[in-house]
């Protein structure tokens, strides 16, 4: 619910001022924590979704009994399941908005579908094909319908299409260069019938649009290392690995026990970001993971990180008897389910 509320808030901020930084936050909240809160079959849920889970510690600490290592079928206070259903059903309201003057259609999230809007009196459809969040390519085809008077609007219509320049691309210029539109560089009398302007993280394409005009995009998706805010005590000195809008996490399922001992050689990663590479994983068709080369105390090791929704496809690790004497309850082995942040290696 907290992640969904963050998406609500970011959308309201977009209505006040169309700035890409708000859409970046909204996208991150929707694609990561919100989706990870529900299993793929929709039958089990997380009530809380912390960055790290230590099942053994949660079992022993009565204050953390509500933190579960696996999704639960239901809760006594079950506001989260219907909240997830509501936002998934209404995701189109987060992907597109129309400016108050009725002349601009904003694309905030790049997802496949058809957006319908009336722009300056003309019925417009934007037919979008996108491969995000795994790949940065796609296209949006303009379809013109009838105007406000009911007449055919096959003739060019003037309006603006504004496309968000995602922060994860690596700068507005790089993102804008990845977008091209029909009519921007035509020869003859129709030369540059569509013009571009970058403002507040959006690329505004304005001009005389024709039925069938196409906007193509192919955003680069480098693996990025993000430092946590040191004012959050538990996150000080930690980093997250992100590719596109997806935040990745490390699990004992792939990396063995004692995830808390993992260190990232931040200097090496900053010097050569290609060390963190993307590869397909075998546990589920289409799932994508990151191989992150961590610097151990003695030797380099390869650590695997998976997108936050991945635990929906996995069984919890085998249970172990707590070392508390005879009759102790069985609890899952010391096995954090999520570790979105890896500690940064620091010199003494």
Model-predicted segments: where are they?
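Surface-exposed beta-strand/loop patches in extracellular or lumenal glycoproteins
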Residues: 156-169
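C-terminal beta-rich recognition modules with glycine/proline-rich loops and embedded aromatic residues
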Residues: 24-32, 37-137, 143, 150-154, ...
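Well-ordered alpha-helical scaffold segments within catalytic/enzyme domains
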Residues: 5-18, 35, 143-147
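Solvent-exposed beta-strand/loop surfaces of large extracellular or lumenal domains
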Residues: 171-206, 225-231
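Short beta-strand or tight-loop elements
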Residues: 138-140, 159, 201
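Well-ordered alpha-helical segments within folded domains of soluble proteins
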Residues: 1-14, 81-91
